[in-house]
Amino acid sequence: MERRDRMRISTAQKFGWGSQAQTGRRFVLRIFMVILSLEKLRQGSLLCMTPSHGNAHSSAHRAMSSTKPPTTTNKRKRTSNAHDEAPAKRVPEASSSKVTLDDSQPAPATSSDAVLGARSAPGTDYERVPFSTLNLSPPTTAAIERMGFETMTEVQARTIPPLLAGKDVLGAARTGSGKTMAFLIPSVELLSTLRFKPVNGTGVIIISPTRELALQIFGVAKELMQGHSQTFGVLMGGANRKAEADKLVKGVNLIVATPGRLLDHLQNTKGFVFKNLKALVIDEADRILEIGFEEEMKQIIKLLPSENRQSMLFSATQTTKVTDLARISLRPGPLYINVDETKEASTADMLEQGYVVCESDQRFMLLFTFLKKNLKKKVIVFFSSCNSVKYHAELLNYIDVPVLDLHGKQKQQKRTNTFFEFINAPAGILLCTDVAARGLDIPKVDWIIQFDPPDDPRDYIHRVGRTARAGKSGKSLLFLLPSELGFLRFLKVAKVPLNEYQFPQKKVADVQKQLESLISKNHYLNTSARDGYRSYLQAYASYSLKKIFDVNKLDLAKVGKAFGFAVPPKVNISVGSVKAKKSRDEDESSDDDGQPKKAYYRNRGRK
């Protein structure tokens, strides 16, 4: 775009909001628990305390000779005993949202005991169990020390010992609990103990729902396997398939893969040796199924050898489909581990959560004001569509609010570069779709902003899981229209505690006229704004909670103003399910046109 078109948007003078009320009761309770724990420790009755690290990685290996791995009879047995300024907030009244819950409300799914098998004891104290108690191989122990981990998280302390003992595990743990290390350590130890070599082919396969999560797991595996001789690699859509195939033929002992690309290689890559597979890990199983890979997973399970294979399945939620996948992938009677079943909240304890109610035409100005105030923080902003991310990133960068953007329509190299740039940045703003909402371990995120609300409380939980990880604190803010307040009832059922945040109107930068002038004069931004506006309506029309998110009740004049239009443009939107097509896209694009069933919207603002 030409620089002469540039029109700067001026903001109000320096502003701030009142500091949040502190919860003294929680602080006193924590002090009391620390004193009690110290007393128990003195008496020798306390096993452990809350670990300070979240993402730990570990490996277990078994001996292997020539081309055929020996049987794994000598498995090591382990016992499993069992400053930034924030808006003022207020607790909303219980009767403030008058919404009748109906059959569309997501209900907690249960799993069959026949599938789950034995349960590890949830009442056992697993705090501060050191990794040194696991008797891991020297290379793995050294790698864990280099990574800065000393003690295990609860999911690691409850999962790693039975996995080292060769058991199958079905694990349920909230995001940020350290489960990546929980399955990587036994996997690496397994390959090491079996002395896998490239000629033996693949011994461990780890399946991940998204490319970004696959890259992250691969990065952790790389650190963990630094002192080992085994080979490792990643397979994912968007990467060079021929280069992947060449490496597979040479022999890759540990593979991290997305479902579609893995199935492709299993079916079509000659020379890919996976007959010696000894461990299968399915991470974020619920998400894999949600985005439409149920049939691919069934085919993968059918193609992989099951004899003498250890399997691990991790899922944040236990749905019927997850249970069915566990039934076909795990051996009978797996150990079921749920580290969250005794917790009162579904989100992290150190997470401060709030929501703000504002009309559509105030949304961008409030977001702009918030981001300007938090430029020195690390912030992730979630949108419902790729085009909306693209438009807001172009606009904010144009008006001197530097941001990064990440969504499913970007080429893989762009996504990868953006992902690692944000991870390594001490501060910054990332605009994204739900492609970044699951499993990714992004350090030191201060704020999660859900500019477009999710359609399901589970998606809300996964989004806010990008902050307050590994015992650290974090904050989240959910934007809601007045008509969307009923969503709070669903969050309450899902055990998500929120306070209402109030932003003083005089503190919000009134840049509407400048925004409309810029969009009307800059052709490039105008086109991008039109695409973002259309995609926002498409995504809204695809929401399943129609009584709360009803596209026909939107004030389009106000929605148009949020995208910089004095008069909302005429656009065609698909009122079919965006998710239906999205589910087939391994990119996890949140902005697909769906089927060509069209509705026409123009100038339908409320009087």
UniProtKB/Swiss-Prot annotation:
Motif segment (Bipartite nuclear localization signal): 362-378
Polar residues: bias regions: 94-113
Helicase C-terminal domain sequence ranges: 350-519
EC main group: hydrolase
Main localisation: nucleus
Catalytic activity: ATP + H2O = ADP + phosphate + H(+)
Protein name: ATP-dependent RNA helicase HAS1
SUPFAM superfamilies in the record: P-loop containing nucleoside triphosphate hydrolases
UniProt motif Q motif: location: 129-157
Function (record text): ATP-dependent RNA helicase involved in 40S ribosomal subunit biogenesis. Required for the processing and cleavage of 35S pre-rRNA at sites A0, A1, and A2, leading to mature 18S rRNA.
Keywords: ATP-binding, Helicase, Hydrolase, Nucleotide-binding, Nucleus, Ribosome biogenesis, RNA-binding, rRNA processing
Motif DEAD box, residue numbers: 283-286
Similarity section: Belongs to the DEAD box helicase family. DDX18/HAS1 subfamily.
GO molecular function terms noted in the UniProt entry: ATP binding; ATP hydrolysis activity; RNA binding; RNA helicase activity
Origin: domain of life: Eukaryota
Biased composition (Basic and acidic residues): 81-92
Xref: Pfam families: CTE_SPB4, DEAD, Helicase_C
